[in-house]
UniProtKB/Swiss-Prot annotation:
Residues 147-161 have a biased composition (Polar residues). GO terms for molecular function: actin binding. This is Ponticulin-like protein K. It is a lipid-anchor; GPI-anchor.
Length: 187
């Protein structure tokens, strides 16, 4: 019986550690088809907020050799929670010819606190939190002819399946079992 309770306690501690507000990862898929993009800049907007927030990633690229593009994204947001979800995003400002850039890619959001204004009742237009992230791709095909088409900028986030706001009932249950176990020994 004691071993079972200790097992519950161990699992509860692991769950609580995983639920701590550490660096989060956003996984997303690039489902757009990309052709030759020589001399052009790839940009992607990705909504990372739960409830209609307008903050988004802006991902730009720089070509390091014939077929490899390095992507770097930056985000500024007043939402301290970096969601962990799968999103569908579209590339634009580049020819949409050939299935060449695929995912998923992981974006690590590192949040850094900045001093809040003295008057907290008035919301500040500047973000209270910032983060930066980077990712890379080595699967961009540069054999297609260069085009100048510019599709409209679009965001297509998938259904939000985040459970970060749901209480960890299993961890709470484990601690309750531990308390009962301690009180039972004293009685």
């Amino acid at each position: 019986m004691k071993n079972l309770i200790l097992l519950f306690l161990l699992i509860s501690i692991i769950n609580l550690i995983q639920s701590l507000p550490l660096d989060s990862v956003i996984n997303f898929y690039v489902n757009s088809t990309v052709g030759s993009c020589k001399g052009k800049q790839l940009e992607v907007s990705l909504d990372v907020c739960n409830n209609g927030c307008s903050n988004s990633f802006k991902i730009t690229s720089s070509k390091d050799n014939v077929n490899n593009y390095n992507f770097t994204s930056y985000i500024e947001t007043d939402d301290k929670q970096c969601l962990t979800n799968n999103y569908t995003i579209n590339l634009f400002n580049c020819s949409i010819d050939n299935a060449a850039l695929v995912g998923p890619y992981s974006v690590k959001c590192i949040f850094k606190e900045t001093p809040s204004p003295s008057n907290s009742s008035n919301p500040s237009p500047s973000p209270n939190t910032t983060s930066s992230s980077s990712l890379s791709s080595s699967s961009l095909n540069s054999n297609e002819p260069n085009q100048t088409t510019k599709p409209p900028k679009t965001n297509e986030p998938q259904k939000n399946n985040s459970t970060s706001n749901i209480p960890n009932f299993f961890a709470i249950f484990g601690f309750l079992v531990l308390i009962i176990f301690i009180l039972g020994d004293k009685i």
